[in-house]
Amino acid sequence: PLLKLVRSRIVWLLVLAVSAILTVKVLDSFESVLEQAVVLSLFIPLLTGTGGNTGNQAATTVTRALALGDVRKSDVLQVMWREMRVGMLLGATLGILGFIIASLVYDVHIGIVIGTTLLGICTLSATVGGVMPILAKVVGADPAVFSNPFISTFCDAAGLIIYFFIARAVLGL
């Protein structure tokens, strides 16, 4: 039984470990932005962690609903719409808090970058997190094993892209 559990998990973890290179490539492509505003690097763990947590909460909720029969594969659009709105509200709340703290500790421009990024990351992560268990079920994968690692990997890379595009626009980098 132990090796069977390992086999059921290792394939996805290996695929995702390799795909995590995407996150490294994103950071590499925005190296000049980080060099011009080093303070941005301090917020990376907060932003990627928030994205992963938001997406994983949504995935866990939907995975449970799938297991209980409260959600079916055909409900994907309704789930996507609901989780997008939940993510926006969570992102707005966390974004306001992030804006206030970053503005007080650094400056208002950094606050705008952090607040806006939290809104975008939470919206995207909740949407992806809500849809991923359903897609996993459609392709015959176990949503409980596949969803959370994929969400974390995807949201890290996508969240950093959102972050650096917003930073470039707001800070003029």
Predicted feature locations:
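Conserved, well-folded catalytic cores of nucleic-acid-processing
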Residues: 9, 13, 29, 53, ...
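Juxtamembrane helix-loop transition segments at the membrane interface in multi-pass membrane proteins
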Residues: 30-39, 54-79, 129-152, 167
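Soluble-to-membrane junctions at the N-terminal ends of transmembrane alpha-helices
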Residues: 1-17, 73-92, 111, 115
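Alpha-helical transmembrane segments in multi-pass membrane proteins
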Residues: 12-20, 43, 47, 51, ...
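Alpha-helical transmembrane segments and their helix-entry boundary regions
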Residues: 5, 79, 110-111, 144-149, ...
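Residue-level micro-sites within transmembrane alpha helices that shape
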Residues: 8, 52-56, 82, 155-158
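Cytosolic regulatory modules rich in charged/polar residues
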Residues: 1-44
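Helix-coil boundary and interhelical linker segments in multi-pass alpha-helical membrane proteins
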Residues: 28-39, 103-110, 165-173
